[in-house]
Swiss-Prot record:
InterPro entries tied to this protein: Ribosomal_uS14, Ribosomal_uS14_bact, Ribosomal_uS14_CS, Ribosomal_uS14_sf
PROSITE patterns: RIBOSOMAL_S14
Gene: rpsZ
Protein name: Small ribosomal subunit protein uS14B
Free-text function comment from the UniProt entry: Binds 16S rRNA, required for the assembly of 30S particles and may also be responsible for determining the conformation of the 16S rRNA at the A site.
Taxonomic source organism: Staphylococcus epidermidis (strain ATCC 35984 / DSM 28319 / BCRC 17069 / CCUG 31568 / BM 3577 / RP62A)
SUPFAM superfamilies given in the database record: Glucocorticoid receptor-like (DNA-binding domain)
Taxonomy, superkingdom: Bacteria
Upper classification of the organism: Bacteria, Bacillati, Bacillota, Bacilli, Bacillales
Classification via NCBIfam families: PRK08061.1
Essential cofactor(s): Zn(2+)
GO cellular component, one term: small ribosomal subunit
């Protein structure tokens, strides 16, 4: 889990738009966040395996 102070700091409006970054809405992780789902890769994988993300299936070819 992310530090509470870092999550609070990120939620405030930044002075410059360049400083804004995505953060996982579930755990607060700042890296490897899928914008479409607003989830990090770890949370995305957990929820996808449980079938809680509609339209997402495990690939097989």
């Amino acid at each position: 889990m992310a530090k509470t102070s870092m999550v609070a700091k990120q939620q405030k409006k930044q002075k410059f738009a360049v400083r804004e970054y995505t953060r996982c809405e579930r755990c607060g992780r700042p890296h490897s966040v899928y914008r479409k789902f607003k989830l990090c890769r770890i949370c995305f994988r957990e929820l996808a395996y449980k079938g809680q993300i509609p339209g997402v299936r495990k690939a097989s070819w």
